[in-house]
Regions:
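Short glycine-/polar-rich loops that comprise or flank the Walker A/P-loop
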Residues: 175, 185, 210-214, 258-262, ...
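C-terminal-of-GTPase-core extension/linker across diverse P-loop GTPases
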Residues: 55-56, 70, 74-144, 149, ...
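Intrinsically disordered, low-complexity, charge-rich segments with an acidic bias
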Residues: 11-24, 46-54
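A conserved segment at the C-terminal end of the G1
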Residues: 152-163
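Switch II of P-loop NTPase G domains
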Residues: 125-131, 136-138, 171-175, 187-215, ...
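Polybasic, low-complexity intrinsically disordered segments
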Residues: 33-50
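Short beta-strand-centered segment that lines the nucleotide-binding/catalytic pocket of NTP-utilizing
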Residues: 163-178
C-alpha cells in the first residue's frame, strides 16, 4: 500500500482558536474583496475595499451587521439557514458603488440556492431527485472525480447503498447520500456526478458548499488520468473551489470561495503491476500535493483506512451525555470538532439548554473525574458530560 502523508492541520494552542478553524470549512479565494484579515468563519474579517464595474478600487465599508451575517453564513451547514443568512447579508450590505459586485454575487447565490431548495421540496413530494443534501453524521464528505473512476462503486462498498454502477460514463446524475460507519459514528458520504468539460453540472458547486471534505477518486489505469485530474481542478477553480491538503484558518477575501480539504483515492489499485511508479508519475506530472490512499472498490483493499483518516484529520470529537444519577448514554455520541466546548455540546442537545446552562460536570481526558466546568471548557474525544441548567 502506498504510504499516504497526513493532511496537515495547524494546531493552535488555545481552544477558542481551534473552533473557528475546524468547525467550519476553511474557505478562501482571490475573490471580490481586498485587505481582509481574520479567522475562518468571518468572525474577525475586516474587509476594506471592492472593485467597481470599471475596475476602480473603492471603499466597501461593510457594516458590523453585514459582517455578523456573513460570519453566520460561513458557519452554517444547513441549506435553509444559509439562505436566511444570505438574505440578511443582502439586506445589511451598504448599497453603493463599492459593493456592486458583492451584491450581484449574493443575489446569484440566493437564486441558485433557492432553486436547489425548491428541487428538494418537489423531490420530496413527487419522488424526484433532491439537489440539496442536508448534513448528517460526524461530517459530510463528497465523492468527486472524472468519469468512470469508480466513485459509485466505492460509495456502494463504503455505505452499502444502492448507488447505480455502470460501465458507461456519467451514470450518476444526481447526489446520492449514504452513511459510512466508523466505530460508533457515521460519516455522510455523497456520491456526485462526474466532473468533465463535456458534461457540466450547474448545481454541483452549490452542493459542495455544505461539505466538510472531499474524496477525489482517480483511476491510475486510465491513460488520460493526468488530463482528467487537471480538468477537475480547472473546472472547480473556475467556480472558486480549491481542493487542498491543508485544513487551516486563512485570511479570507471572498465569502463564497471554498477550500475543500481533500484525500485522493487511487482506485483500482488491484489492477496495477507497479502502483508506486504510477503514483510517483501522477504526482510529478500533475503537481498534486494531496494525500493519497491506494484503494480497490472491487476487493476492498485500503477502504478500512478511510474512516480513521477522516476521523483524525477532521478533528472529530465524540461526547457522551448523562443525566444526574444515571449512567452515560454510550450508544449515540454527539460529534463536535477539536476545540469545541461544553457550550457547543449544550447547543447540540437543545438551543434552550444552551441559554439556560449554568455549569457542567465532565469525566474524561479534558478534566478530572466529575470536574465542574463552565461554558468555555474544551471537550476531548470520549468525554462524558453532565449538563446542569
Amino acid at each position: 500500500m502506498v504510504r499516504s502523508p497526513s493532511l496537515r492541520v495547524d494546531e493552535p494552542d488555545q481552544c477558542d482558536e481551534t473552533e473557528g478553524d475546524l468547525e467550519g470549512k476553511a474557505e478562501v479565494g482571490s475573490g471580490l474583496l481586498g485587505a481582509s484579515v481574520g479567522r475562518v468563519g468571518g468572525l474577525e474579517l475586516h474587509q476594506e475595499h471592492n472593485r467597481s464595474e470599471d475596475g476602480d478600487i473603492v471603499p466597501a465599508n461593510l457594516s458590523p451587521d453585514y459582517k455578523a451575517a456573513e460570519a453566520a453564513f460561513r458557519k452554517s451547514r444547513d441549506p435553509s439557514e444559509r439562505m436566511e443568512w444570505l438574505r440578511e447579508m443582502l439586506r445589511t450590505i451598504p448599497k453603493h458603488k463599492g459593493t456592486e459586485h458583492l451584491q450581484a454575487d449574493i443575489k446569484a447565490r440566493i437564486k441558485g440556492l433557492a432553486e436547489q431548495l425548491e428541487s428538494a421540496t418537489k423531490g420530496a413530494g413527487h419522488g424526484g431527485p433532491a439537489l440539496v443534501i442536508r448534513p448528517e453524521g460526524a461530517a459530510q464528505i463528497v465523492l468527486i472525480g472524472p468519469p468512470n473512476a469508480g466513485k459509485s462503486s466505492l460509495h456502494t462498498r463504503l455505505t452499502g447503498s444502492a448507488a447505480h454502477v455502470g460501465l458507461y460514463p456519467f451514470t450518476t446524475q444526481y447526489p446520492k447520500a449514504g452513511m459510512m460507519p466508523h466505530e460508533d459514528v457515521h460519516f455522510q458520504l455523497i456520491d456526485l456526478p462526474p466532473i468533465a468539460q463535456e458534461h457540466p453540472v450547474p448545481w454541483l458547486v452549490n452542493t459542495l458548499q455544505t461539505a466538510d471534505a472531499a474524496l477525489l477518486v482517480v483511476d491510475l489505469g486510465e491513460p488520460s488520468c493526468i488530463e482528467q485530474l487537471q480538468a477537475v481542478r480547472s473546472m472547480l477553480g473556475q467556480q472558486r473551489v480549491t481542493l487542498t491538503e491543508r485544513l487551516e484558518a486563512t485570511a479570507d477575501e471572498d465569502p463564497f470561495a471554498l477550500r475543500l480539504p481533500t484525500l485522493m483515492l487511487a482506485n483500482k489499485a488491484d489492477g496495477m503491476a507497479d502502483f508506486d511508479a504510477e503514483l510517483l508519475a501522477l504526482r510529478e506530472l500533475s503537481g498534486s500535493r494531496l494525500p493519497v490512499f491506494a484503494v480497490s472498490a472491487a476487493t476492498g483493499h485500503g477502504l478500512g483506512d478511510i474512516g480513521p483518516w477522516l476521523f483524525q484529520n477532521l478533528g472529530i470529537v465524540r461526547v457522551y451525555t448523562k443525566t444526574p444519577g444515571h449512567p452515560a448514554d454510550k450508544h449515540r455520541p454527539f460529534t463536535l470538532r477539536r476545540g469545541q466546548t461544553v457550550g457547543d455540546v449544550a447547543r447540540l442537545v437543545h438551543q434552550d439548554l444552551a441559554r439556560s446552562l449554568r455549569y457542567a460536570r465532565v469525566w474524561g481526558r479534558s478534566g478530572f473525574e466529575g470536574q465542574q466546568v463552565g461554558h468555555d471548557h474544551c471537550v476531548a474525544d470520549g468525554d462524558i458530560v453532565e449538563l446542569h441548567a
